[in-house]
Amino acid sequence: MRIILLGAPGAGKGTQAQFIMEKYGIPQISTGDMLRAAVKSGSELGKQAKDIMDAGKLVTDELVIALVKERIAQEDCRNGFLLDGFPRTIPQADAMKEAGINVDYVLEFDVPDELIVDRIVGRRVHAPSGRVYHVKFNPPKVEGKDDVTGEELTTRKDDQEETVRKRLVEYHQMTAPLIGYYFKEAEAGNTKYAKVDGTKSVAEVRADLEKILG
C-alpha cells in the first residue's frame, strides 16, 4: 500500500501516520530523514546532496526523486510506504509519475485554517521532558506549569501565530494545488483519493482511515 498524505501543517497528519505505519506495516518516508540518511551513508546520491546543502542551496527535485526511488527499493518498503512532505508541488508530482513511482491512496486531511491556528498556537511544552499540553484541549493542572515537575511551560518558536499563518499561506500557494492534481489522477483511475475530516477526534479519524484503507 503506497500512500501520500496531504494537508496543512497542524492538520493531524503526524498522529495518523503513526497509526497507519503500525497497522499496515509500512515505513514513513520523510524527505528530510531520507536526505540525512543518504548524506550519512556516503552514497553517490548522498554526496551530491551534501555538496548542494553545504553550498546553502535547495536539493533539486531530480535528486530527491532519485533518493525516493532508491529508498522505496529497500526491503522494508516491499508492502508499501507512506510519503509525508513530498511531493509538495505539481512538478514534483509529475516527476514522481514519470519515474514510475505509483501511489495507491492520496489522503487529504481537511481542517479549516482557524482551527489549525487554534490547535498550534495553544500548544505549550515542557522542554526538558517533551511533554506537550494545550491551553484549551489538554490544559495542565496549574496554568502555565508542568504537571509532573511544576516547572514553567514554554511556547515553541514555530508555534507562534505569525509563523503558523505564514506556513499556512505557503501551504495554500504551493501544496494545495496538488489536491486538484490528485483528484484528476483519481478520476483517471491512476490512484484513489479520499478527503479525511481532520476536525474529528483522533479516534474518529483513525476509524475513518480504517474504512478507507480497509
UniProtKB/Swiss-Prot annotation:
What is the protein's species of origin?
Shigella sonnei (strain Ss046)
Major localization class: cytoplasm
Entry-linked HAMAP family? Adenylate_kinase_Adk (MF_00235)
Concerning its family, UniProt says: Belongs to the adenylate kinase family.
Q: Which PROSITE patterns match?
A: ADENYLATE_KINASE
Q: Which domain of life does the UniProt lineage start with?
A: Bacteria
User: Where do the annotations place AMP binding?
Assistant: 31, 36, 57-59, 85-88, 92, 156, 167
NMP: annotated segments? 30-59
Chain positions found as N6-acetyllysine: 192
Q: How does it assemble?
A: Monomer.
Reactions catalysed according to its record: AMP + ATP = 2 ADP
Tell me the domain comment: Consists of three domains, a large central CORE domain and two small peripheral domains, NMPbind and LID, which undergo movements during catalysis. The LID domain closes over the site of phosphoryl transfer upon ATP binding. Assembling and dissambling the active center during each catalytic cycle provides an effective means to prevent ATP hydrolysis.
Keywords (alphabetical) are:
Acetylation, ATP-binding, Cytoplasm, Kinase, Nucleotide biosynthesis, Nucleotide-binding, Transferase
Q: What is its EC number?
A: 2.7.4.3
Q: What does this protein do?
A: Catalyzes the reversible transfer of the terminal phosphate group between ATP and AMP. Plays an important role in cellular energy homeostasis and in adenine nucleotide metabolism.
Protein name per the record: Adenylate kinase
List, alphabetically, the NCBIfam families matched: adk, PRK00279.1-1, PRK00279.1-2, PRK00279.1-3, PRK14527.1
State the Pfam families in the record.
ADK (PF00406), ADK_lid (PF05191)
Q: Would you kindly state one Gene Ontology biological process term found in this protein's UniProt entry?
A: AMP salvage
> What gene codes for this chain?
adk
Q: Which InterPro entries match?
A: Adenyl_kin_sub, Adenylat/UMP-CMP_kin, Adenylat_kinase_CS, Adenylate_kinase_lid-dom, P-loop_NTPase
Q: Name a GO molecular-function annotation.
A: ATP binding
